[in-house]
């Protein structure tokens, strides 16, 4: 049974998030979408782009992610290797009169939730990565991905599941992708660091920001933010909104791990495609939203 917070977005809220200003898409191979007039490119209004976004959501094709590019005034739809030409045509058909607003791009690999401070944490459902240690007064918690805490109750520090860390006290997935675990083991060190990097504050991502990710599978990798407020359809009804898109690689087991920029906490690893041998696209839950939802802070 899934544990969910009661803060799921309404359709109206989703539309607001979708129409937020976005930019900086990663370089991926494009599938050309013909325009009505190639010599004079059309421009599309915010309402048309929102309608196109709703149409892509309604098409419900797993392995897709989309966000608005304010420079070209197009809805950029990224499709992974599992999406067929027929499904791409289905997306275009769903967009109807706004199909010309779509720019469809192909990325290698498959979008997946990456379940299997970066340190490994274990539940009855698998292994994830600890995001950031946080606190509210004298009570200590850690943040991780919501698809990790969804359905998980107790968390351990080792694969043998003999050293208890704590219990899930909140989870928000799908729609969002964050969860919080309250420490119940008072003997566990609760450093406010990620590896050797001290984390002193939290910040919102910006396009082009240099960022670093740490995870229990692949360790530490760096890259940059390529877009904001992306929607990702992982399949099976698991759609998340408002994600940070990056060109930082990640692999299964890295889920929930921290994304940071210097001393600032930025996000929690959600999912993506590719791997750390060939590269890939990875999406992150903004950490400021989770901190606000649970009334906690980094330290």
UniProtKB/Swiss-Prot annotation:
Q: Which cysteines are joined by disulfide bonds?
A: 128-148, 249-276
Catalytic EC class:
hydrolase
E.C. number: 3.4.21.81
Would you indicate the residue range of the signal peptide?
Answer: 1-38
Q: Which GO terms describe its biological process?
A: proteolysis
| GO MF | serine-type endopeptidase activity
Highest taxon in the source lineage: Bacteria
The chemistry this enzyme catalyses reads:
Hydrolysis of proteins with trypsin-like specificity
Identify the propeptide residues.
Answer: 39-114
Q: Where is the active site?
A: 147, 177, 255
Report one GO cellular component. extracellular region
What are the record keywords, sorted?
Disulfide bond, Hydrolase, Protease, Serine protease, Signal, Zymogen
Write down the InterPro entries for this protein, in alphabetical order: Pept_S1_alpha_lytic, Pept_S1A_streptogrisin, Peptidase_S1_PA, Peptidase_S1_PA_chymotrypsin, Trypsin_dom, TRYPSIN_HIS, TRYPSIN_SER
The family this protein is said to belong to = Belongs to the peptidase S1 family.
How does the record describe its quaternary structure? Answer: Monomer.
The entry's function note states: Has a primary specificity for large aliphatic or aromatic amino acids.
Instruction: Report the protein name in the record.
Output: Streptogrisin-B
Lineage at the top is: Bacteria, Bacillati, Actinomycetota, Actinomycetes, Kitasatosporales
Q: Which gene encodes it?
A: sprB
């Amino acid at each position: 049974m899934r544990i969910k917070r009661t803060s799921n977005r309404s359709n109206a809220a989703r539309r607001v998030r979708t129409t937020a200003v976005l930019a900086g898409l990663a370089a991926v191979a494009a599938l050309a979408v013909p325009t009505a007039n190639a010599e004079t490119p059309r421009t599309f209004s915010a309402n048309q782009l929102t309608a196109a976004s709703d149409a892509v959501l309604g098409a419900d094709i797993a392995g897709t992610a989309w966000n608005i590019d304010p420079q070209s005034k197009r809805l950029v739809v990224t499709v992974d290797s599992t999406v067929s030409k027929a499904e791409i045509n289905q997306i275009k058909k769903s967009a109807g009169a706004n199909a010309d607003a779509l720019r469809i791009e192909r990325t290698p690999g498959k979008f997946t939730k990456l379940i299997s401070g970066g340190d490994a944490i274990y539940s009855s459902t698998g292994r994830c990565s600890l995001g950031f240690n946080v606190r509210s007064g004298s009570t200590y918690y850690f943040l991780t991905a919501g698809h990790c805490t969804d359905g998980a109750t107790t968390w351990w520090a080792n694969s043998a599941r003999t050293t208890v860390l704590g219990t899930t006290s909140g989870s928000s997935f799908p729609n969002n992708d964050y969860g919080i675990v309250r420490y119940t083991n008072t003997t566990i060190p609760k450093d406010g660091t990620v590896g050797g990097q001290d984390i002193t504050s939290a910040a919102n991502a910006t396009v082009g920001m240099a960022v670093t990710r740490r995870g229990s599978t692949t360790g530490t990798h760096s890259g940059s933010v390529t877009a904001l407020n992306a929607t990702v359809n992982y399949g099976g009804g698991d759609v998340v909104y408002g994600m940070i898109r990056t060109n930082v690689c990640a692999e299964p087991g890295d889920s929930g791990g921290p994304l940071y920029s210097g001393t600032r906490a930025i996000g929690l690893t959600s999912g993506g495609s590719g791997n750390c041998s060939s590269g890939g696209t990875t999406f992150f839950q903004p950490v400021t939203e989770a901190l606000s939802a649970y009334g906690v802070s980094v330290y």
